[in-house]
Amino acid sequence: MFFFGIFRCNMDHWTTKRQVYIYLCFSLMTIALICYLIHICCHTKKNVVTNALPSNNMALIPYTPSNNMALIPYTPSNNTVPPPYTISGSCPQ
């Protein structure tokens, strides 16, 4: 009988401990989910802005047989504006 009394006290103790752990795990998972959603939202907003920009500061130069629509790196110097995108009107046969 004494054994069952100790067992019951221990069960109550572990039940309370388990409830605290479950509550803490649930709280941490909720906080992690909120942080993850904020992270995704920020990346989505960042991609909307960066998708409108030329990738890697590359400027498209007009077609000639020697460069064949090559991409060249654009390096700005002293408040210059990058050249506009141009596409050649002639198509190779």
UniProtKB/Swiss-Prot annotation:
Keyword Phosphoprotein listed: no
Protein name (record): Uncharacterized membrane protein KP93L/DP93R
Note: Encoded by inverted terminal repeats (ITR) sequences.
Location (main, coarse): host cell
Organism: African swine fever virus (strain Badajoz 1971 Vero-adapted) (Ba71V)
Keywords, alphabetical: Glycoprotein, Host membrane, Membrane, Transmembrane, Transmembrane helix
Annotated glycan sites: 78
Recorded topology in the membrane: Single-pass membrane protein
GO CC annotations on file: host cell membrane; membrane
Membrane-traversing stretches: 20-40
